[in-house]
């Protein structure tokens, strides 16, 4: 599913709120940054925390909800109208934001 780092989400809201009205062609915008699989997330986490034990059990009801969502979103209008540009791709989100935050919190 499409994900993004929280700083990018906050920046998107602030940038949209301050965008000139005459540049906005709609009242709602999609924003996205990356779309990793569970296995990709697992690999990055294990690289940072080799002792981690990661397992999951699929809950069919929750999975049905996730399966009903689009696999990706088109954020082209946000990029065009108010120059949305996430700073964090998948690698940077983990290496520069999520993993350091986890290490700091649980050190």
Segment roles from a protein language model:
Residues 2-107:
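C-terminal substrate-binding subdomain of Rossmann-fold SDR/epimerase-dehydratase oxidoreductases
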């Amino acid at each position: 599913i499409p994900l993004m780092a929280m700083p990018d989400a906050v920046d998107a809201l602030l940038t949209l709120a301050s965008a000139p009205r005459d540049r906005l062609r709609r009242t709602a915008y999609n924003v996205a940054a990356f779309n990793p699989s569970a296995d990709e997330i697992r690999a990055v986490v294990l690289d940072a925390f080799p002792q981690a034990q990661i397992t999951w059990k699929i809950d069919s009801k929750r999975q049905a909800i996730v399966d009903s969502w689009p696999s990706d979103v088109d954020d082209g209008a946000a990029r065009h109208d108010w120059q949305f540009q996430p700073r964090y791709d998948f690698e940077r989100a983990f290496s520069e934001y999520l993993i350091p935050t986890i290490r700091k919190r649980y050190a």
